[in-house]
Amino acid sequence: MQNKLAIWSTENKERKFDRLLRLVADRTWLIEAARITLASSGAKTPGVDGVDKRKMEENLHHELATIRTELLTGLYNPLPARRVYIPKANGKMRPLGIPCLRDRIVQRAMLMVMEPIWESDFHPVSYGFRPARSVHHAIRTVKLQLQDSGRGSKGRWVIEGDLASYFDTVHHRLFMKAVRKRIADQRLLDLLWKLIKAGCIDRGLFRASSEGVPQGGVISPLLSNIMLHEFDTWMEANYLNEKKRSVRWGWNESVRQQWPIAVREQRQWKPAISYCRYADDFVLVVKGTKADAEVMREACRGFLEDQLKLTLNMDKTRITHVNDGFVFLGHRIIRKRGPRGRMRPVSMIPWEKYRRFAEKLVKQLSGDYSKNRMDMMEHLNRQLGGWAAFYQYTDHTATMFSKLDRTVFWKFGYWLARKYRCGFRSLMRDYIDAPEAGQAKTWVLEGQNSRGWYGAIALRRLITSRKGHFTWRTPSENPYILREEIRHTIESRYADVAFAMSNT
């Protein structure tokens, strides 16, 4: 059914879908939504009703039947989310709302209906919280947009877009107006209105929701993308489509000078614009002067405030030259001179990201000496593996990877020495070895963890992590439309590059 919804949505961009609530309340649909919800790690965390995964599974069929009846009769009312606060990298706290499990099941069922429809509408350079897309897609796209265009190439200015408290300031009426462009089922619209108006329980007190979309629910990323799709549409209509790009003809100074003088005098030169968005973070690349970039920033601010009632944080929305570098989605992107003398964009690990991660690991290894040594090594390996996977396509990682390897290697050795109150040299003699033939030596421990598993574990070395060149396959297509596997030929590689650079 998701395949049909995606096909219908793709074939007719103006189609409004009706009778969708019947699909949300379908028995098979709810069973699948419950299976996905209860299989997630967050199912163990209860909402305001105190029901966790174990309690829900004990009476699942009766609960799903009750949910279905309430949905079809219009009596279903979402409970307020339980608000918790998690620390952010800058030391501040981020509020999250944890819905109860029955609301999470309903949200999952709604997501399974709505996402195939909107995936046909969302802009190709929108990557945040969408299926078959990731941070690496966005970074790769920005790097392609910053490629040196050759002779006469002007400097490029980058606008780092920052929306102030986006999730908490979404205008409910404007959001529902955007949803009605695709949904004509009034019962589903009423359910969605109840969802965004459910409020939360914060420190034992109820907080009503007058604006914003709930953070923490499975449907929240889709709702945020629906709202910001209006910004994508405005960018496409005014700066990115082929007609607008033909007016912005100043990409190459040598080409521009070849135009007849009469044509040059009658046509006003405008800077070319590139755009990439990941959730509420976006980047604009302006090929022109800094004044052109400031005009573009002001135009974005005006549209967001006047049409969407969103605030662009002008203090954090910086304008930076690409040669000075900027940070986007945890990567530092800068244009450097390559081995053949041409300027090329590279992505690197920001020093601040490295420092915070290293300090986090050092803090973990500076105490808790009673912890099982196998559990400690497993915990370290999971963190190191996740960090290496996130930066596996980043350029120039060898220095930071080797530096972090040395830090963790020596700090873990001192942790073992404090734990067993023995000399460092004896520990190195007993526990330093090569995990496999030809690999670098590291800490190799054998023993039993707290879960009862017995075996040998080696401390992960980042310098040996897999590195590669990131590629994607047809990210502009709706992933819910079933297709035969497309062979990745030379022609399809050129299509990938052309897609990423289509707005440059």
Named regions from a protein language model:
Residues 1-62:
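Non-catalytic, polymerase-adjacent accessory regions of viral genome-replication enzymes
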Residues 376-423, 427-431:
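Non-catalytic, peripheral interaction segments enriched in hydrophobic/basic residues
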Residues 197, 203-206, 307-374, 378, ...:
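A conserved non-catalytic segment of reverse transcriptases
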